[in-house]
Amino acid sequence: MSQADLLDQDPVFQLKGSMLAVTILELAHNDLARLERQLADKVAQAPNFFRDTPLVMALDKLPEGEGRLDLPALLEVCRRHGLRTLAIRAGREEDIAAAQALDLPVLPPSGARERPLDIKDSAPRKPAEEVRPSAGEPRPEPAKPEEKPAEPASRPTKVVKTPVRGGMQIYAAGGDLIVLAAVSPGAELLADGNIHVYGPMRGRALAGVKGDATARIFCQQLAAELVSIAGNYKVAEDLRRSPQWGKAVHVSLSGDVLNITRL
């Protein structure tokens, strides 16, 4: 048998099953102008998290009678805000046909319970307009500035004591997230600060989602689908090549490189 024959028998690819956690944008109304405004507000609160985010566009909850959806325009709105649509979830024939015309995969409607991602509004409030007195009226005394409450000694920490199952999404706004149990494939942990997992970490862990490059990820057993700090990430295919796979590790960010070290 020649060398060429041996090379032909050597497989150049493998088909593997995988459970990936993907963000779902569930459209409630066919109003692209309003979607553009609201999406811009969300992205402004966590720009690093929404950068090149893979997305499933769910159209199966759209109410009847809202008119034909302009799918190319909808995808362009998402693209402008860094959301990359991988597939469409739909049940209506016209939506399925529109997706197929764009060569987009179509997923069937889902009956699973999906938790919304709660990103709190961090935009500053507009100052109140100054009211000027009319001529002859006494000028009111300036209001005394309100005393601001003392800053907390530490950032708030969210503690989860039960296993985090596939499809669940937990977000620690403004602080750290501590999980005292296992995290299953398909689960997603997000925190503005650090993430600690005192058990096997098999889902996705995204720390510093608002851009904190000093955030860290700690876990007792690294088997994650994805780890990310301030928008810099590694997926399971990269993580499995690390000698730290399956071990207790500490993940930190140096420049734009994720470092994984043993605990």
Curated annotation (Swiss-Prot):
Gene3D superfamilies: 2.160.20.70, 3.30.70.260
Organism per entry: Pseudomonas paraeruginosa (strain DSM 24068 / PA7)
Chain intervals for the UniProt region annotation (Disordered): 107-160
Record-stated family: Belongs to the MinC family.
Sorted UniProt keywords: Cell cycle, Cell division, Septation
Function: Cell division inhibitor that blocks the formation of polar Z ring septums. Rapidly oscillates between the poles of the cell to destabilize FtsZ filaments that have formed before they mature into polar Z rings. Prevents FtsZ polymerization.
Subunit structure: Interacts with MinD and FtsZ.
Basic and acidic residues: compositionally biased ranges: 112-150
Origin superkingdom: Bacteria
Source organism phylogeny: Bacteria, Pseudomonadati, Pseudomonadota, Gammaproteobacteria, Pseudomonadales
Record-linked Pfam families: MinC_C, MinC_N
Identification of the protein by name: Probable septum site-determining protein MinC
One GO process term, biological-process aspect: regulation of cell division
